[in-house]
């Protein structure tokens, strides 16, 4: 098995990882680059693979930096399944349509600006219609349910505690008479939050692809965070 990092490796956004065997190609996430003009330009570039050759996408959650290029993937030839949790499937309908709407409006604004300057209009990265087409390929799966994505790979979604529907992905790949386990963390939540469940503890893996944006930071205890929030509220209302 080969792993190619196609986003979120030298930056925070654009999560997209290509897993390839001799017989299969799948993606873990297909997120949008965000942050400014340089990141926007990355979204316009061709994928470093042929979208038509990708069998499926296994999606960690519905934040745009993890799912936001799915309509572009479909627009450029992908016709496979998009596997995600039930809650993520529900959120995708809102998130992707909203993202398509934003791209349409930004293109309209830039085109009006270009017209005044005598330049050509621009096309949106993708549209609401592209997002609606993408939703046809979504295949919801429950947490903790083992399912096959092809004759070599099996997947389980575990609660990541990040947002509603977020998942840590366990992927088993049978290759050369061996079975290798890859774990993709997606974005991880923290412990003991009042609304979301704690992230699942994964005890064993051969390969780990892990979110590390805040990996070098010490997080305060919940009680400390609550006190800090209360102090901010009191100061704000006292102005």
Task: Put a short name on every predicted segment.
Residues 2, 16-25, 46, 207, ...:
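Catalytic cores of nucleotide-enabled group-transfer and carboxylate-activating enzymes in metabolic
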Residues 9, 21-80, 84-136, 188-197, ...:
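Pre-active-site segment of Zn-dependent metallo-hydrolases
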Residues 2-6, 20-21, 141-199:
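Catalytic core of the metallo-beta-lactamase
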Residues 81, 168, 188-239:
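Cap/insert and terminal regions of metallo-dependent hydrolase folds
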Residues 13:
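Flavin (primarily FAD) cofactor-binding/catalytic cores of flavoenzymes
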Residues 22-25, 52-54, 78-79, 151-153, ...:
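Short coil/turn connectors at secondary-structure junctions
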């Amino acid at each position: 098995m080969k792993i190619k990092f196609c986003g979120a490796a030298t930056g925070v956004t654009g999560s997209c990882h290509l897993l390839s065997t001799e017989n299969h190609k799948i993606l873990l996430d297909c997120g949008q680059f965000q942050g400014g003009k340089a990141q926007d330009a990355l979204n316009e570039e061709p994928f470093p693979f042929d979208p038509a050759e990708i069998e499926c996408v296994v999606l960690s959650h519905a934040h745009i930096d993890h799912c936001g290029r799915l309509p572009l993937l479909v627009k450029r030839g992908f016709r496979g399944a998009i596997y995600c949790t039930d809650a993520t499937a529900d959120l995708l309908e809102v998130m992707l349509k909203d993202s398509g709407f934003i791209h349409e409006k930004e293109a309209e604004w830039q085109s009006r600006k270009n017209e005044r300057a005598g330049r050509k209009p621009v096309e949106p990265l993708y549209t609401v219609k592209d997002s609606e087409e993408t939703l046809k390929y979504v295949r919801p799966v429950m947490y903790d349910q083992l399912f096959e994505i092809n004759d070599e790979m099996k997947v389980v979604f575990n609660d990541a505690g990040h947002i509603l529907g977020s998942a840590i992905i366990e992927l088993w790949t049978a290759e050369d008479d061996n079975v290798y386990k890859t774990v993709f963390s997606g974005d991880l939540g923290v412990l003991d939050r009042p609304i979301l469940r704690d992230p699942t503890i994964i005890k064993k893996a051969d390969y780990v692809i892990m979110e590390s944006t805040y990996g070098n930071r010490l997080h305060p205890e919940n009680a400390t965070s609550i006190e800090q929030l209360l102090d901010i509220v009191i100061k704000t209302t006292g102005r």
